[in-house]
Structure formats: C-alpha cells, structure tokens
C-alpha cells in the first residue's frame, strides 16, 4: 500500500477536462488503480517489468504503476491528444515522467505502428461498449495480447455482470488463458449531462488474460 503522501498525490491527479462520450471516457479512481496494481503485483510481480497502458486516457493506471513499482519500461497509448496532454502533466506531478513514454495512436487501426510483442504486461480500463459499440472491450483485450510477449499478461477491467460471457469467449482464443482474479468496486461519478445520479457504484472484475508460451 502506498504511503499517505502518495495516495494524496494520486487522488489529486487531473481527470478529463471535456470527456468524449464517443470514446467512453471515464476517469479511473485512484483507489481502484491502487487496488488493481496491488493485485497485479501479487499475481505476477511488477519489478523490472515492461508495461503498456492501452487507452491510457489521463494516465491514472500507468502513473500509479510507475509510482508504486520499479518498472523497466512504461508506455501509455491513446488516440486522444487532449487526454495525453493531461496524462503528461500527471506524470510530471508524480515525478515519474523520466520513466514513462506516451504514444498517440488508434489501437484499433491495424496499420497503427505499435510495438507489438515487446511488453511483459498490459493494463487496460477499456470502454465497456454501448449498444452502438458492443464488443469493443474485447477488442482492446485482443490488442493487449498482441502487445505482450509469449508468457506475458493482460489485466483488464470489465463489468462483473459480463464475467461469464468474457471468460467463455476467451476460451475460444488459441494460446490464451483467462481467469477473474478480483472483484472490485468502482465509484463512478456523474461524467456526462445525461447522468442522473451524482455517482454510481459498479462491480467490476479484474480479468487476467495470459498469453501462453508458444
């Protein structure tokens, strides 16, 4: 568990200034990010790992990981240049900017120049997918699996209500193992005008997708 000063700093990181609904932009809470990183460290060990944060947004996940652990490489990738500017400021606030890199890219574009097969672990808080964008969360996971080396891991957050569906679908992928390693709570504040409640408490799963050695 980070010390109180670190927890306070993470809690003060900037979120989206003008979140884009088409990108399903929601800021990950510092509490959720810390819990996620602790569980990942317990599962595979973070020290010396090469990490990629896919769809990093304002950088809560990558900033938390770089603050808590001695990682060899940390790369954040996002399509939104405005979010990446905020992410850059957050990395400076946490004083980890020298150990982190950012890349603007559309990960869903097959022609994007991405460093595939080079990371030990990918972390993702993907879009959950609306009725007009169903399945995008699993597309993010598949991109994550492309980014990690054989034997590497993808850790992704998904609504607990979709657990059976996700694990069932992952079984169809060759060379991939999947398990739910934690159920967590995400206190999601109202982000868009159509949100009626000030906050919603969502049950989310941290799913571990393992890219098996070939």
From Swiss-Prot:
Signal peptide: none annotated. Disruption phenotype: Worms are viable and do not display obvious developmental defects; they however exhibit significantly longer lifespan and heat resistance. Cells show reduced N6-methylation of adenine(1717) in 18S rRNA. GO terms for biological process: positive regulation of translation in response to stress; rRNA base methylation; rRNA methylation. Coiled coil: none annotated. It holds the Pfam family MTS. Its EC number is 2.1.1.-. It comes from the Eukaryota. SUPFAM superfamilies: S-adenosyl-L-methionine-dependent methyltransferases. Keywords: Methyltransferase, S-adenosyl-L-methionine, Transferase. Heterodimer; heterodimerizes with TRMT112/C04H5.1. Belongs to the methyltransferase superfamily. PrmA family. Catalytic subunit of a heterodimer with TRMT112/C04H5.1, which specifically methylates the 6th position of adenine in position 1717 of 18S rRNA. This is rRNA N(6)-adenosine-methyltransferase metl-5. The gene is metl-5.
